[in-house]
């Protein structure tokens, strides 16, 4: 026996144990024995603490942290996370199979066990232009990689219901191999939900209400209960959890900024919220560990038991789940919030760098003609990814929408950035700034789910152009412009989505960017100025979105007009 963890309480799936030591040899748990009954080369005293299985994030887009997989590992391991089920569809929408390959290779050798679901919808719909198109034949070779678990979130629900041949071929491929197929079905209910599940979809992470959680479980699906940087709905969704259905519930982040992970924790925030909402700690732990392991076929992790991999998170209490020690593959990986076992340094290939190709831009690119006095507006919903359609009175100047004359409204632009097509969509956004505020500047980012075109919110065409040109010259990232001057810029050179810097360095820069952003503009409550804006381009979440092809009505699955 090489290692013995002593003096602690522990969770073993269905009950708490005390007076038991955990024996570890190599990367395996070799026994649970009475305290002091076995000698080991190394004794780790965990008196007063509780040993839990290392946490599992059941659905996450690593790219949303804006870190590469290796640096993401260094961020979340000290938070007690041992395994993540990642969907690399962000970078796949920019770089196709090359992006998937980069993520898998960059994750190799990390202490964090990074498993992948293959992107099912690149692009998410035919109503936008991404950097690549992936079909079943493109995905098939990746299923031979042991890091790949299944097929990632199927977002094109209308395509499934209509029997889209290419989409169903991807689902059939995964099912033929016995792999799970994740879903993405916001607002879908009744017979359409049953048809979606019957197509082979095994989970959904897009629930917004307890009723939606219950409906999916009734259809035999697992539900990934989400608490991310923009979508913060876990407290609401937990109202659906009962002792009878808890085994079908998993925790996930989906999309979370690095600075948010550092501030609120990774999976600990889910555990903390669950206990605050009255869920027994044991049940919460299962939802953060074994439930996800069982659903995704991870047979070595999720429990503290003989023969299982020694992936353990040690906490000092079961209220806020403060993580003090993390053991992965039997090694001490982190302690007191500091990474000890760092991921190997990886060289970033030139082929994934500097991907902003918009073609020429001018102020006219951002001109939004309106002939009437009313407009169809995208209204943001605080702390959610859903949007609503709103008809608002607007003021124009020379026949063009003038954000400077419309308090509470900003102009939104999505510009195709992959193939210099010249495509651009324009819309009006409410709920981004306070109702009585004006935005005398612009915010732009090359993160715009899921096709990741260039997205810009602003109060003047000149500032929006300045922001766009800044990112075109930089090769991707986030930029803040006020009255013609670039006030802050954060480069994201990897596909325009991720930094090459460490988590520690990037979080400091990201925090400074956000501080500057919030000091210059009056954003509405419950809005992440970057992440919330980035999701306004995703045409698979109701109700109204903007792509590089125009304003899109998700409910009708058809384009609409700003003009009323």
Feature map (PLM): residue ranges:
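His/Asp/Glu-enriched, well-ordered alpha-helical/loop segment
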Residues: 240-321, 327, 446-457, 468-472, ...
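Short, small-residue-biased leader/transition segments that mark boundaries at the very start
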Residues: 1-12
């Amino acid at each position: 026996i090489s290692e013995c963890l002593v003096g602690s309480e522990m969770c073993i799936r269905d009950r708490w144990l005390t007076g038991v030591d955990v024996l570890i040899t190599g990367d395996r748990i070799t026994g649970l024995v009475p305290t002091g009954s076995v000698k080991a080369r190394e004794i780790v005293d965990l008196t007063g603490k509780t040993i839990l299985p290392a946490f599992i994030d059941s659905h996450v887009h690593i790219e949303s942290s804006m870190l590469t997989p290796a640096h993401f590992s260094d961020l979340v391991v000290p938070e007690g996370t041992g395994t993540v089920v990642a969907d690399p569809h962000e970078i796949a929408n920019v770089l196709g199979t090359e992006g998937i390959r980069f993520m898998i290779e960059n994750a190799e050798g990390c202490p964090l066990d990074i498993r992948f679901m293959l992107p099912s919808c690149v692009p998410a719909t035919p109503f936008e232009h991404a950097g690549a198109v992936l079909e079943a034949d493109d995905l098939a070779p990746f299923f031979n990689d042991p890091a790949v678990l299944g097929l990632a979130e199927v977002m094109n629900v209308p395509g499934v219901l209509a029997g889209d041949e290419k989409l169903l071929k991807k689902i059939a491929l995964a099912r033929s191999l016995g792999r799970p197929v994740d879903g993405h079905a916001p607002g879908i209910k009744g017979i359409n939900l049953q048809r979606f599940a019957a197509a082979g979809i095994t989970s959904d992470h897009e629930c917004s209400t307890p009723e939606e959680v219950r409906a999916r479980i009734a259809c035999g699906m697992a539900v990934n209960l989400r608490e991310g940087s923009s979508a913060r709905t876990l407290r609401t969704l937990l109202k659906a959890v009962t002792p009878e259905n808890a085994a079908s519930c998993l925790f996930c982040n989906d999309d979370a900024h690095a600075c948010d992970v550092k501030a609120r924790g990774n999976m600990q925030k889910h555990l903390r919220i669950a206990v605050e909402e009255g869920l027994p700690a044991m049940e919460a732990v299962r939802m953060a560990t074994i439930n996800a392991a069982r659903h995704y076929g991870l047979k070595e992790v999720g429990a503290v038991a003989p023969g299982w991999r020694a992936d353990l998170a040690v906490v000092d209490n079961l209220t806020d789940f403060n993580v003090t020690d993390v053991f992965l593959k039997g090694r001490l990986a982190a302690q007191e919030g500091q990474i000890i076992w760092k991921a190997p340094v990886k060289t970033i290939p030139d082929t994934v760098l500097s991907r902003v190709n918009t073609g020429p831009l001018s102020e006219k690119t951002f001109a939004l003609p309106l002939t009437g006095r009313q407009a169809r507006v995208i209204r943001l919903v605080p702390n959610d990814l859903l949007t609503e359609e709103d008809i608002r009175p607007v003021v124009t100047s020379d026949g063009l929408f003038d954000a400077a004359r419309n308090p509470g409204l900003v102009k939104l632009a999505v510009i195709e950035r992959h193939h210099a097509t010249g495509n651009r969509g324009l819309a009006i956004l409410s709920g981004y700034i306070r109702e009585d505020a004006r935005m005398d500047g612009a915010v732009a980012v090359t993160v715009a789910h899921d096709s990741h075109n260039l997205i810009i919110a602003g109060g003047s065409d000149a500032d929006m152009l300045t922001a766009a040109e800044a990112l075109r010259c930089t090769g991707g990232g986030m930029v803040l412009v006020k009255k013609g001057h670039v006030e802050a810029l954060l480069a994201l050179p990897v596909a325009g989505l991720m930094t090459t810097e460490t988590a520690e360095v990037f979080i400091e820069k990201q925090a400074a960017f956000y501080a500057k952003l919030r000091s210059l503009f009056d954003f509405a409550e419950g809005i992440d100025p970057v992440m919330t804006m980035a999701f306004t381009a995703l045409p698979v979440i109701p109700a109204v979105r903007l792509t590089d092809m125009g304003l899109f009505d998700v409910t009708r699955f058809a384009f609409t007009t700003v003009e009323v």
